[in-house]
């Protein structure tokens, strides 16, 4: 079965895992991705495709460009992969084309968290530019990219929970860190990463991860970590063997299937930076910040002593 790769770039592999790649034809491969992801197992009206992919061309030239694109794709994917309704609509037959983006979403739906986390290879159509396309196509790409990123964050977070429950604390840290890389500004993701580091006996790294998160929010959004995130750091206590007792926090509603926040920007509901003139929105007082920094330093020192011991 041909395989379409859309995460971290764009490529069509013709004969399965070991087959040759099709020559690069960006707009035509994005058209294939659109048929596979925007309307899976459904037909798309040809006039809609013309408006999305060739808005600058006249009617005759646009129809000709679509015919050539479909001819190119049929030669590589197979005529049997395409279904249609005369000259009015076209689509892909069910199961005719494997796509990495679809594989991620299907794994998430089926709660195969580790598989979904491993399958996410980067941003949807990262670095791909479709020349002379309609703004609506660019908006679809952006929405799909955000949806898949959120799916990968959820998958990595839940896979981290599974690894932690199984006692694989190293893998839990890796997966929680993967989620943190994808959503570096989300409080719930930061809490999970800090807690995973603490449970793995890396209290100093947990404190540093929190400090880096707080610095990002202050720098980029003029905001401070949520009270729950600050409370997690304050609650971290190290046992004699250096292992943190913090539990992995629950995933926020922003990462839950079916949540209206799933396709959101990935930030908690924080006030804008200019909500309080002359101050950082939601920031602590100077005394509170000094106390928090001192607490972080104490945790880091305890962790270093525990590791030496």
Identify the residue ranges that each predicted region occupies.
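Intrinsically disordered, charged and Pro/Gly-enriched terminal/linker segments
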Residues: 2, 19-30, 34-42, 48, ...
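C-terminal flanking helix
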Residues: 70, 74-81, 214
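N-terminal flanking helix/linker immediately upstream of nucleotide/cofactor-binding cores
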Residues: 281-283, 309
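Conserved catalytic core of two-component sensor histidine kinases
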Residues: 67
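Long, compositionally biased low-complexity repeat segments characteristic
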Residues: 254-256, 284-294
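Short, Lys/Arg-enriched N-terminal segment that forms or immediately precedes the first helix
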Residues: 7-20
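Long, intrinsically disordered low-complexity tandem-repeat segments
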Residues: 290-308
């Amino acid at each position: 079965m041909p395989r379409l790769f859309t995460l971290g770039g764009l490529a069509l592999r013709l004969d399965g895992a070991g087959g040759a790649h099709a020559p690069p034809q960006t707009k035509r491969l994005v058209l294939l991705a659109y048929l596979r992801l925007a309307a899976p197992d459904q037909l798309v009206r040809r006039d809609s495709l013309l408006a999305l992919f060739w808005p600058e061309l006249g009617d005759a030239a646009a129809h000709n460009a679509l015919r050539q694109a479909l001819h190119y794709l049929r030669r590589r994917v197979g005529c049997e992969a395409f279904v249609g309704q005369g000259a009015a609509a076209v689509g892909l037959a069910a199961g005719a084309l494997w796509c990495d983006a679809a594989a991620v979403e299907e794994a998430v739906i089926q709660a195969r968290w580790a598989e979904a986390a491993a399958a996410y290879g980067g941003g949807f159509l990262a670095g791909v530019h479709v020349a002379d396309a309609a703004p609506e196509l660019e908006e679809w790409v952006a929405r799909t990219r955000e949806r898949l990123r959120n799916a990968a964050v959820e998958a990595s977070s839940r896979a981290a929970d599974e690894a932690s429950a199984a006692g694989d604390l190293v893998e839990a840290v890796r997966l929680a860190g993967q989620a943190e890389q994808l959503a570096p500004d989300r409080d719930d993701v930061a809490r999970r990463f800090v807690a995973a580091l603490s449970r793995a006996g890396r209290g100093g790294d947990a404190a540093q991860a929190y400090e880096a998160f707080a610095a990002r929010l202050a720098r980029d959004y003029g905001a401070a970590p949520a009270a729950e995130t600050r409370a997690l750091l304050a609650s971290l206590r190290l046992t004699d063997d250096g292992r943190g007792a913090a539990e992995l926090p629950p995933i926020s509603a922003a990462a839950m299937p079916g949540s209206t926040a799933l396709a959101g920007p990935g930030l908690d509901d924080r006030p804008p930076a200019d909500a309080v003139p002359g101050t950082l929105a939601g920031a602590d007082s100077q005394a509170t910040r000094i106390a928090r920094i001192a607490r972080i330093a104490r945790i880091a020192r305890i962790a270093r002593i525990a590791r030496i011991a």
